[in-house]
Amino acid sequence: MKLLSIAIPCYNSEAYMEKCIESLLKGGEEVEILVVNDGSSDRTAEIADAYAEKYPTIIKAIHQENGGHGEAVNAGIRNATGLYFKVVDSDDWVNEEAYKQILKTLEELTRGPKTLDMLISNFVYEKQGASRKKVMQYRHCLPVNEIFGWDSVHMSKGKYLLMHSIIYRTKLLHECGLELPKHTFYVDNLFAFEPLPFVKNMYYLDVNFYRYFIGRDDQSVNENVMIKRIDQQIRVNKLMADAFHNCQFDSKHLKKYMLSYLDIITTVSSIMLVRAGTQEALDKKKEMLEYIREQDLWLYHKLRYSILGRAANLPGRGGRKMFVAAYKVCQKFYGF
Protein backbone atom coordinates (compact mmCIF):
# COMPACT_ATOMS: atom_id res chain seq x y z
CA MET A 1 0.00 0.00 0.00
CA LYS A 2 1.20 3.49 -0.84
CA LEU A 3 1.74 5.88 2.05
CA LEU A 4 0.12 8.93 0.43
CA SER A 5 -2.30 9.40 -2.45
CA ILE A 6 -2.31 12.87 -4.01
CA ALA A 7 -5.13 13.89 -6.35
CA ILE A 8 -4.52 16.66 -8.89
CA PRO A 9 -7.82 17.95 -10.33
CA CYS A 10 -7.07 19.23 -13.84
CA TYR A 11 -9.26 21.20 -16.21
CA ASN A 12 -7.49 22.78 -19.20
CA SER A 13 -4.32 22.83 -17.12
CA GLU A 14 -1.72 22.32 -19.85
CA ALA A 15 0.08 25.59 -19.03
CA TYR A 16 0.98 24.74 -15.44
CA MET A 17 0.17 21.13 -14.48
CA GLU A 18 3.68 19.86 -15.26
CA LYS A 19 5.22 22.10 -12.60
CA CYS A 20 2.76 20.65 -10.09
CA ILE A 21 3.41 17.03 -11.11
CA GLU A 22 7.19 17.46 -11.13
CA SER A 23 7.12 18.83 -7.58
CA LEU A 24 5.11 15.80 -6.42
CA LEU A 25 7.32 13.23 -8.16
CA LYS A 26 9.99 14.05 -5.57
CA GLY A 27 8.01 11.83 -3.19
CA GLY A 28 9.10 8.71 -5.07
CA GLU A 29 7.51 5.30 -4.67
CA GLU A 30 5.83 6.10 -1.35
CA VAL A 31 3.42 8.34 -3.22
CA GLU A 32 0.55 7.69 -5.61
CA ILE A 33 -0.23 10.65 -7.89
CA LEU A 34 -3.75 10.67 -9.36
CA VAL A 35 -3.98 13.12 -12.26
CA VAL A 36 -7.71 13.65 -12.79
CA ASN A 37 -8.52 15.07 -16.22
CA ASP A 38 -11.95 16.63 -15.77
CA GLY A 39 -13.11 16.76 -19.39
CA SER A 40 -10.39 19.12 -20.60
CA SER A 41 -10.35 20.37 -24.20
CA ASP A 42 -6.63 21.23 -24.34
CA ARG A 43 -3.54 18.98 -23.97
CA THR A 44 -4.26 18.08 -20.33
CA ALA A 45 -5.25 14.48 -21.17
CA GLU A 46 -2.18 14.00 -23.36
CA ILE A 47 0.15 15.30 -20.65
CA ALA A 48 -1.51 13.14 -17.98
CA ASP A 49 -1.16 10.00 -20.13
CA ALA A 50 2.48 10.76 -20.94
CA TYR A 51 3.34 11.04 -17.25
CA ALA A 52 1.40 7.87 -16.42
CA GLU A 53 3.31 5.99 -19.12
CA LYS A 54 6.68 7.33 -17.92
CA TYR A 55 5.99 6.69 -14.21
CA PRO A 56 3.56 3.71 -14.21
CA THR A 57 4.20 2.79 -10.56
CA ILE A 58 3.62 6.34 -9.30
CA ILE A 59 1.20 8.17 -11.59
CA LYS A 60 -2.28 7.17 -12.67
CA ALA A 61 -4.23 9.20 -15.23
CA ILE A 62 -7.98 9.33 -14.66
CA HIS A 63 -10.23 10.69 -17.42
CA GLN A 64 -13.84 11.70 -16.85
CA GLU A 65 -16.55 13.88 -18.32
CA ASN A 66 -16.50 17.38 -16.94
CA GLY A 67 -17.99 17.39 -13.46
CA GLY A 68 -16.19 20.32 -11.88
CA HIS A 69 -13.52 20.53 -9.20
CA GLY A 70 -15.59 18.67 -6.63
CA GLU A 71 -16.19 15.67 -8.88
CA ALA A 72 -12.48 15.56 -9.71
CA VAL A 73 -11.73 15.37 -5.97
CA ASN A 74 -14.42 12.69 -5.62
CA ALA A 75 -12.69 10.68 -8.37
CA GLY A 76 -9.41 11.03 -6.51
CA ILE A 77 -10.95 9.72 -3.29
CA ARG A 78 -12.62 6.80 -5.11
CA ASN A 79 -9.37 5.74 -6.79
CA ALA A 80 -6.96 6.39 -3.92
CA THR A 81 -5.11 3.35 -2.59
CA GLY A 82 -2.79 5.20 -0.22
CA LEU A 83 -3.14 5.24 3.54
CA TYR A 84 -3.46 9.04 3.48
CA PHE A 85 -4.99 11.44 0.97
CA LYS A 86 -4.23 14.98 -0.16
CA VAL A 87 -5.48 17.31 -2.90
CA VAL A 88 -3.05 19.57 -4.76
CA ASP A 89 -4.57 21.86 -7.38
CA SER A 90 -2.92 21.79 -10.80
CA ASP A 91 -1.68 25.40 -10.64
CA ASP A 92 -0.09 24.90 -7.21
CA TRP A 93 3.02 23.00 -6.12
CA VAL A 94 4.83 21.77 -3.01
CA ASN A 95 8.17 22.52 -1.35
CA GLU A 96 10.61 19.63 -1.76
CA GLU A 97 12.24 19.73 1.68
CA ALA A 98 8.90 20.08 3.48
CA TYR A 99 7.54 17.24 1.32
CA LYS A 100 10.29 14.92 2.54
CA GLN A 101 9.52 15.82 6.15
CA ILE A 102 5.81 15.19 5.58
CA LEU A 103 6.46 11.70 4.21
CA LYS A 104 8.98 10.89 6.94
CA THR A 105 6.51 11.97 9.63
CA LEU A 106 3.62 9.99 8.13
CA GLU A 107 5.82 6.91 7.89
CA GLU A 108 6.89 7.22 11.53
CA LEU A 109 3.31 7.78 12.70
CA THR A 110 2.03 4.68 10.89
CA ARG A 111 4.33 2.63 13.13
CA GLY A 112 2.96 4.25 16.29
CA PRO A 113 0.23 2.98 18.64
CA LYS A 114 -2.43 5.43 17.41
CA THR A 115 -4.01 5.73 13.97
CA LEU A 116 -3.61 9.32 12.81
CA ASP A 117 -6.71 10.90 11.26
CA MET A 118 -5.31 14.19 9.99
CA LEU A 119 -1.89 15.74 9.45
CA ILE A 120 -1.67 19.53 9.29
CA SER A 121 1.10 21.64 7.76
CA ASN A 122 1.58 25.25 6.66
CA PHE A 123 0.90 26.74 3.25
CA VAL A 124 2.20 29.84 1.50
CA TYR A 125 0.16 32.30 -0.54
CA GLU A 126 2.14 32.69 -3.77
CA LYS A 127 0.28 35.84 -4.77
CA GLN A 128 1.41 37.30 -8.06
CA GLY A 129 2.76 40.82 -7.61
CA ALA A 130 2.49 40.76 -3.81
CA SER A 131 5.22 42.57 -1.87
CA ARG A 132 5.35 39.76 0.69
CA LYS A 133 4.34 36.13 0.80
CA LYS A 134 1.91 35.33 3.56
CA VAL A 135 2.53 32.06 5.36
CA MET A 136 -0.48 30.42 6.98
CA GLN A 137 1.02 28.69 10.00
CA TYR A 138 -0.54 27.34 13.19
CA ARG A 139 2.29 27.24 15.71
CA HIS A 140 0.43 29.35 18.30
CA CYS A 141 -2.85 27.51 17.76
CA LEU A 142 -1.85 23.84 17.76
CA PRO A 143 0.65 21.65 19.60
CA VAL A 144 3.73 20.98 17.45
CA ASN A 145 5.18 17.53 16.69
CA GLU A 146 2.75 15.53 18.80
CA ILE A 147 -0.59 13.79 18.42
CA PHE A 148 -3.46 15.77 19.93
CA GLY A 149 -7.26 16.05 19.98
CA TRP A 150 -9.75 18.90 19.58
CA ASP A 151 -9.39 19.99 23.20
CA SER A 152 -5.87 21.18 22.31
CA VAL A 153 -7.04 23.28 19.35
CA HIS A 154 -7.18 27.02 20.06
CA MET A 155 -7.64 28.79 16.73
CA SER A 156 -7.62 32.58 16.67
CA LYS A 157 -9.74 34.62 14.27
CA GLY A 158 -8.28 34.46 10.79
CA LYS A 159 -6.82 30.98 11.30
CA TYR A 160 -8.51 28.11 9.52
CA LEU A 161 -7.56 24.63 8.36
CA LEU A 162 -7.93 24.91 4.60
CA MET A 163 -7.61 22.20 1.98
CA HIS A 164 -4.01 23.28 1.39
CA SER A 165 -3.00 22.50 4.97
CA ILE A 166 -4.79 19.16 5.38
CA ILE A 167 -3.88 15.52 4.79
CA TYR A 168 -6.67 13.10 5.77
CA ARG A 169 -6.59 9.38 6.45
CA THR A 170 -8.16 7.96 3.29
CA LYS A 171 -10.52 5.55 5.04
CA LEU A 172 -11.85 8.41 7.16
CA LEU A 173 -13.07 10.13 3.98
CA HIS A 174 -14.85 6.91 3.03
CA GLU A 175 -16.31 6.52 6.53
CA CYS A 176 -17.72 10.05 6.63
CA GLY A 177 -19.29 9.62 3.19
CA LEU A 178 -17.83 12.83 1.77
CA GLU A 179 -19.30 13.52 -1.66
CA LEU A 180 -18.60 16.97 -3.06
CA PRO A 181 -21.22 18.53 -5.37
CA LYS A 182 -20.67 18.53 -9.12
CA HIS A 183 -20.18 21.65 -11.21
CA THR A 184 -19.55 23.78 -8.14
CA PHE A 185 -16.53 25.88 -7.25
CA TYR A 186 -15.41 26.60 -3.66
CA VAL A 187 -15.95 22.99 -2.58
CA ASP A 188 -12.50 23.02 -0.96
CA ASN A 189 -14.31 24.59 2.00
CA LEU A 190 -16.57 21.54 2.26
CA PHE A 191 -13.51 19.28 2.01
CA ALA A 192 -11.92 21.08 4.96
CA PHE A 193 -15.17 21.16 6.97
CA GLU A 194 -17.49 18.16 6.61
CA PRO A 195 -15.03 15.41 7.67
CA LEU A 196 -13.88 17.21 10.85
CA PRO A 197 -16.35 15.52 13.26
CA PHE A 198 -14.81 12.18 12.23
CA VAL A 199 -11.30 13.42 13.04
CA LYS A 200 -10.37 12.30 16.54
CA ASN A 201 -6.64 12.99 16.52
CA MET A 202 -4.26 15.23 14.62
CA TYR A 203 -0.58 16.03 14.20
CA TYR A 204 0.84 19.44 13.26
CA LEU A 205 4.13 19.59 11.37
CA ASP A 206 5.39 23.18 11.25
CA VAL A 207 6.75 23.22 7.69
CA ASN A 208 5.78 25.38 4.69
CA PHE A 209 4.64 22.55 2.45
CA TYR A 210 1.94 23.74 0.04
CA ARG A 211 2.44 26.68 -2.33
CA TYR A 212 -0.93 28.21 -3.18
CA PHE A 213 -0.73 30.29 -6.36
CA ILE A 214 -3.00 33.34 -6.62
CA GLY A 215 -2.96 35.55 -9.68
CA ARG A 216 -4.63 34.00 -12.73
CA ASP A 217 -7.43 36.13 -14.16
CA ASP A 218 -9.73 33.10 -14.46
CA GLN A 219 -8.98 31.80 -10.96
CA SER A 220 -12.02 30.97 -8.84
CA VAL A 221 -10.81 33.15 -5.93
CA ASN A 222 -10.48 36.20 -8.19
CA GLU A 223 -13.03 38.65 -6.78
CA ASN A 224 -14.76 39.38 -10.09
CA VAL A 225 -14.96 35.66 -10.82
CA MET A 226 -16.41 35.01 -7.35
CA ILE A 227 -19.13 37.59 -7.93
CA LYS A 228 -20.05 35.94 -11.25
CA ARG A 229 -20.16 32.55 -9.52
CA ILE A 230 -21.86 33.76 -6.37
CA ASP A 231 -24.65 31.17 -6.65
CA GLN A 232 -22.02 28.44 -6.26
CA GLN A 233 -20.53 30.17 -3.21
CA ILE A 234 -24.02 30.40 -1.69
CA ARG A 235 -24.62 26.72 -2.41
CA VAL A 236 -21.44 25.75 -0.57
CA ASN A 237 -22.34 28.11 2.27
CA LYS A 238 -25.73 26.41 2.69
CA LEU A 239 -24.21 22.92 2.53
CA MET A 240 -21.76 23.88 5.27
CA ALA A 241 -24.65 25.19 7.39
CA ASP A 242 -26.48 21.90 6.79
CA ALA A 243 -23.41 19.91 7.83
CA PHE A 244 -23.07 21.94 11.02
CA HIS A 245 -26.76 21.54 11.83
CA ASN A 246 -26.63 17.76 11.35
CA CYS A 247 -23.46 17.25 13.39
CA GLN A 248 -23.53 15.58 16.80
CA PHE A 249 -20.64 17.36 18.49
CA ASP A 250 -18.67 15.50 21.14
CA SER A 251 -16.18 18.35 21.60
CA LYS A 252 -17.01 21.97 22.40
CA HIS A 253 -13.67 23.00 20.87
CA LEU A 254 -14.61 21.36 17.57
CA LYS A 255 -18.03 23.05 17.63
CA LYS A 256 -16.42 26.43 18.34
CA TYR A 257 -13.94 26.00 15.50
CA MET A 258 -16.53 24.88 12.95
CA LEU A 259 -18.81 27.76 13.93
CA SER A 260 -15.94 30.21 13.45
CA TYR A 261 -15.16 28.73 10.02
CA LEU A 262 -18.81 28.93 8.97
CA ASP A 263 -18.92 32.52 10.22
CA ILE A 264 -16.06 33.60 7.93
CA ILE A 265 -17.52 31.73 4.93
CA THR A 266 -20.90 33.42 5.48
CA THR A 267 -19.11 36.76 5.72
CA VAL A 268 -17.27 36.13 2.44
CA SER A 269 -20.60 35.32 0.77
CA SER A 270 -22.06 38.55 2.17
CA ILE A 271 -19.05 40.60 1.01
CA MET A 272 -19.34 39.33 -2.56
CA LEU A 273 -23.09 39.93 -2.64
CA VAL A 274 -22.64 43.47 -1.34
CA ARG A 275 -19.78 44.06 -3.82
CA ALA A 276 -22.05 42.93 -6.66
CA GLY A 277 -24.07 46.07 -5.91
CA THR A 278 -27.43 44.95 -7.29
CA GLN A 279 -30.80 44.53 -5.63
CA GLU A 280 -30.86 40.94 -6.85
CA ALA A 281 -27.60 40.26 -4.99
CA LEU A 282 -28.91 41.87 -1.80
CA ASP A 283 -32.05 39.72 -2.07
CA LYS A 284 -29.84 36.63 -2.37
CA LYS A 285 -27.97 37.67 0.76
CA LYS A 286 -31.25 37.98 2.64
CA GLU A 287 -32.47 34.62 1.28
CA MET A 288 -29.25 32.86 2.35
CA LEU A 289 -29.63 34.04 5.94
CA GLU A 290 -33.32 33.14 5.89
CA TYR A 291 -32.41 29.62 4.76
CA ILE A 292 -30.07 29.23 7.73
CA ARG A 293 -32.70 30.68 10.08
CA GLU A 294 -35.28 28.14 8.95
CA GLN A 295 -32.80 25.27 9.26
CA ASP A 296 -31.31 26.17 12.64
CA LEU A 297 -32.43 29.20 14.64
CA TRP A 298 -29.53 28.86 17.11
CA LEU A 299 -26.99 28.83 14.28
CA TYR A 300 -28.69 31.78 12.58
CA HIS A 301 -28.40 33.92 15.71
CA LYS A 302 -24.74 32.95 16.15
CA LEU A 303 -23.91 33.96 12.57
CA ARG A 304 -26.19 36.99 12.26
CA TYR A 305 -25.10 38.57 15.55
CA SER A 306 -21.40 37.71 15.59
CA ILE A 307 -18.99 40.62 15.09
CA LEU A 308 -18.64 39.71 11.43
CA GLY A 309 -22.36 39.11 11.06
CA ARG A 310 -23.21 42.52 12.49
CA ALA A 311 -20.67 44.18 10.18
CA ALA A 312 -22.09 42.36 7.16
CA ASN A 313 -25.58 43.62 7.96
CA LEU A 314 -24.97 47.29 8.74
CA PRO A 315 -28.08 49.14 7.52
CA GLY A 316 -28.33 51.19 4.35
CA ARG A 317 -25.91 52.09 1.60
CA GLY A 318 -23.56 53.74 4.08
CA GLY A 319 -23.40 50.58 6.16
CA ARG A 320 -22.57 48.52 3.08
CA LYS A 321 -19.80 50.95 2.13
CA MET A 322 -18.29 50.68 5.61
CA PHE A 323 -18.43 46.90 5.39
CA VAL A 324 -16.62 46.84 2.03
CA ALA A 325 -14.01 49.36 3.25
CA ALA A 326 -13.26 47.18 6.29
CA TYR A 327 -12.94 44.16 4.00
CA LYS A 328 -10.37 45.96 1.82
CA VAL A 329 -8.28 46.86 4.86
CA CYS A 330 -8.31 43.24 6.06
CA GLN A 331 -7.49 42.03 2.56
CA LYS A 332 -4.41 44.25 2.40
CA PHE A 333 -3.29 43.50 5.97
CA TYR A 334 -3.69 39.72 5.82
CA GLY A 335 -2.44 39.38 2.24
CA PHE A 336 -5.32 37.29 0.84
Could you tell me what each predicted segment is?
Residues 184, 201-236, 276-283:
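Nucleotide-sugar-dependent glycosyltransferase catalytic core
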Residues 64-80:
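Glycine-rich, basic loop-to-helix element that forms the pyrophosphate-binding segment
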Residues 69, 92-202, 214, 218-226:
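Donor-binding/catalytic cores of nucleotide-activated saccharide
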Residues 85:
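Short aromatic/hydrophobic "clamp" motif used to bind/position activated sugar donors
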Residues 23, 37-46, 68:
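A conserved acidic beta->alpha catalytic loop
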Residues 275-336:
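Membrane-interface aromatic/basic loop that binds lipid-linked glycans or pyrophosphate carriers
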Residues 30-39, 60-65, 89-90:
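Short beta-strand/loop segment that forms part of the nucleotide-sugar
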Residues 22-31:
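Short, acidic, metal-binding catalytic loop of nucleotide-sugar glycosyltransferases
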